[in-house]
């Protein structure tokens, strides 16, 4: 029986050494294995174990029966079948593996199995970093997509900033004043057209500008000056009544409002400490002199932007 096994197993032996184990791999794998052997002639293969001896013929049969089955699936099925075999069925293949090992030791007495641990660890790292490796091209595409999205977002932000400047929703009061001064002074637009195009935007600009200024003044002085913004919000209604002259006078008078508000801060500096303390007290303990200061500031800003004149007796900047 063993002689029959030897005669059956010996002819495929040279095929494996020459073909490089191309039992179910096909001509391409055999050619690649042959090329690898030519590239590394000093490389000596390990002797086959009992499972390899048994699975060599079984793999060929299964590959012929199922040509579309993948080699990994064939290996899984062969491993399951090998576990189901009894010891008596495995014995001839075990003895054949022992004989091949003894023959290998005679042919290569100095052979020592050196596992390629570096490649195995690299393979393990590749397995663990496989999602990263798969995501690496995707990551580049994501990075490029982020770059494109950042570029698009920058373009959108620029567009929104320009739209915000058109509507008066800018970040600083200086830019708001520049926008205010820039609209009626545009050479291609007359005052009437500017007033028709920008009445509501000018309303928003003045509200934002004076609200931003009064918030800082309220924190410093401790007196509520919200009436100032309300009185200034009434000026665009006057601008709607007389289109051209009021728009120019409002634009020219809006920068001096800042200076006048800074001048109007001087009388309140004597009671700054008291006003700051009263600002943090409850509503019932707020002293009554806050109302005159509120009335004073409201009267001051209501009397400011009169059409045709400017604040503090200065001439309007209509010639600009």
UniProtKB/Swiss-Prot annotation:
Any one annotated GO CC term: cytosol
Location within or outside the cell: Nucleus
Entry domain remark: The 9aaTAD motif is a transactivation domain present in a large number of yeast and animal transcription factors.
Covalent cross-link Glycyl lysine isopeptide (Lys-Gly) (interchain with G-Cter in SUMO) as placed by the record, residue numbers: 248
Changes after translation: Sumoylation inhibits DNA binding and negatively regulates the FGF4 transactivation. Methylation at Lys-45 and Lys-120 is necessary for the regulation of SOX2 proteasomal degradation.
Gene: SOX2
Assembly with partners or alone: Interacts with ZSCAN10. Interacts with SOX3 and FGFR1. Interacts with GLIS1. Interacts with POU5F1; binds synergistically with POU5F1 to DNA. Interacts with DDX56. Interacts with L3MBTL3 and DCAF5; the interaction requires methylation at Lys-45 and is necessary to target SOX2 for ubiquitination by the CRL4-DCAF5 E3 ubiquitin ligase complex. Interacts with RCOR1/CoREST. Interacts with PHF20L1; the interaction requires methylation at Lys-45 and Lys-120 and protects SOX2 from degradation. Interacts with TRIM26; this interaction prevents ubiquitination by WWP2.
Keywords: Activator, Developmental protein, DNA-binding, Isopeptide bond, Methylation, Nucleus, Phosphoprotein, Transcription, Transcription regulation, Ubl conjugation
Residues that bear N6-methyllysine: 45, 120
Motif 9aaTAD per UniProt: ranges: 275-283
Protein name listed in UniProt: Transcription factor SOX-2
Region annotated Disordered, chain positions: 1-44, 246-269, 300-320
Ranges of biased composition (kind: Low complexity): 249-264
């Amino acid at each position: 029986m063993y002689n029959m096994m030897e005669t059956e197993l010996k002819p495929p032996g040279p095929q494996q050494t020459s073909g490089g184990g191309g039992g179910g791999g096909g001509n391409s794998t055999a050619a690649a294995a042959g090329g690898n052997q030519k590239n590394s002639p000093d490389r000596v293969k390990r002797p086959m174990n009992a499972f390899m001896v048994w699975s060599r013929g079984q793999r060929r049969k299964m590959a012929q029966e199922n040509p579309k089955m993948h080699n990994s699936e064939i290996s899984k099925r062969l491993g399951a079948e090998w576990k189901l075999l009894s010891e008596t069925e495995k014995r001839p293949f075990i003895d054949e593996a022992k004989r091949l090992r003894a023959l290998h030791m005679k042919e290569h007495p100095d052979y020592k199995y050196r596992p390629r641990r570096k490649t195995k660890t690299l393979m393990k790292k590749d397995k663990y970093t496989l999602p990263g490796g798969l995501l690496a091209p995707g990551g580049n595409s994501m990075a490029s997509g982020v770059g494109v999205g950042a570029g698009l977002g920058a373009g959108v932000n620029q567009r929104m900033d320009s739209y915000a400047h058109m509507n008066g929703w800018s970040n600083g009061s200086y830019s708001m004043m520049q926008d205010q001064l820039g609209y009626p002074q545009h050479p291609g637009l007359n005052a009437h057209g500017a007033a028709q195009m920008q009445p509501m935007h000018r309303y928003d600009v003045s509200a934002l500008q004076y609200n931003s200024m009064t918030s800082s003044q309220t924190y410093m002085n401790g007196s509520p000056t919200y009436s100032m913004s309300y009185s200034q919000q009434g000026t665009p209604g006057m601008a709607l009544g007389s289109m051209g002259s009021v728009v120019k006078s409002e634009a020219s008078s809006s920068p001096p409002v800042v200076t006048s508000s800074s001048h109007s801060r001087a009388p309140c500096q004597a009671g700054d400490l008291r006003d700051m303390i009263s600002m943090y007290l409850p509503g019932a303990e707020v002293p009554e002199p806050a109302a005159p200061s509120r009335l004073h500031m409201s009267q001051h800003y209501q009397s400011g932007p009169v059409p045709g004149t400017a604040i503090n007796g200065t001439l309007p900047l209509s010639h600009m």
